[in-house]
Amino acid sequence: MIKLVYCLRKRNDIDTDSFYRYWLDEHGPLVKSVAEEIGASRYVQSHTKLPELNQLMIESRGLKAPYDGVTEVWWDTMTALERGMSSPSGVEAQRKLIEDEARFIDFSRSRVFMTEEHEIF
């Protein structure tokens, strides 16, 4: 299984509650509406919570501030990913997603990468 991991930071001009609300209530349904076009089989949003516990983990490890959340998108096969990223409808869906992401995500402080999952337990 192929997975995209997208570590998000909100734009500075958006408050935290508005960021989470938009991501969940506006962007989430948009992703669902184009899932077939991009060939995705699963989409999960993980919203950062428990600031006190996060701060303890950061301090104990000497890490930087946490991301505001993480998006994960799965494709069942490399073929599904390639088809979803190269078909005309997939390319248009990606354009829509990126355009919408610019409304609430600070691209310069966020990170995205592709992975192959290895389930341990």
Model-derived segments and their meaning:
Residues M1-F121:
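Macromolecular interaction modules
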